[in-house]
Amino acid sequence: MNKTELIKAIAQDTELTQVSVSKMLASFEKITTETVAKGDKVQLTGFLNIKPVARQARKGFNPQTQEALEIAPSVGVSVKPGESLKKAAEGLKYEDFAK
């Protein structure tokens, strides 16, 4: 499902207009981004957790040249599913997703 499809589905489910849902989703993206940029987490209990995480320096290599290199420490974003998302995936078959 892409963003447009999500907006249509939420609009149908809530009986809101697609314009209202689009504004709400844009606001959610903006506020989530600003919150993570401040170093805080966004927690939708039981559904989703988004937070900044520290990544330590590590050794890596260039796959084309096999040359070793040092990867600098950085800050990334962790997105973890809550129980409701995990349970939603329980009924799926592994074979449908394995390639």
Swiss-Prot record:
Record bears the keyword Transcription regulation: yes
Positions of the UniProt region annotated as May be involved in preference for HM-URA DNA: 52-77, 90-99
InterPro entries the record matches: Hist_DNA-bd, Histone-like_DNA-bd_CS, IHF-like_DNA-bd_dom_sf
Keywords: DNA-binding, Repressor, Transcription, Transcription regulation
Keyword Transcription regulation assigned: yes
GO molecular function: DNA binding; structural constituent of chromatin
DNA-binding residues (ranges): 61, 93-94
Domain of life: Viruses
Family stated for the protein in its record: Belongs to the bacterial histone-like protein family.
Record-linked PANTHER family: DNA-BINDING PROTEIN HU, DNA-BINDING PROTEIN HU-BETA
Functional note: Selectively binds to and inhibits the transcription of hydroxymethyluracil-(hmUra)-containing DNA, such as SP01 DNA, by RNA polymerase in vitro.
Quaternary context: Homodimer.
Protein name: Transcription factor 1
